[in-house]
């Protein structure tokens, strides 16, 4: 993980960026650093900004499940299935369904 990339993304989002990829990137940086709570808070901000940004649901759901927060992860994956269905995103839908099935 690049501390420079993290700093740039933190600056962009703190300045009120509406770019969903900036928020997604920041959440992924936090996740990669093991900062699960920061990542979750950032994913939640992204969901408030753009609930149709389907990629966040898979990444947040699997991150939470890996952190032992399986019920929270399941809820994110289920929300992602709804979002992917609404966007007719079959590829994302398949990945989300597979991830959900993997939780048991």
Model region roles, listed by residue range:
Residues 11-14, 44-48, 82:
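Conserved structural position within tetratricopeptide repeats
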């Amino acid at each position: 993980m690049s501390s420079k990339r993290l700093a740039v993304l933190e600056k962009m989002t703190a300045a009120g960026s509406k770019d969903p990829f900036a928020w997604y990137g920041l959440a992924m940086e936090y996740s990669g650093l093991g900062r699960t709570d920061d990542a979750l808070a950032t994913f939640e901000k992204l969901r408030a900004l753009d609930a149709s940004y389907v990629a966040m649901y898979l990444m947040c759901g699997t991150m939470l499940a890996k952190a032992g927060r399986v019920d929270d992860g399941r809820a994110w994956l289920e929300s992602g299935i709804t979002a992917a269905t609404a966007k007719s995103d079959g590829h994302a839908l398949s990945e989300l369904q597979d991830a959900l099935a993997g939780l048991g």
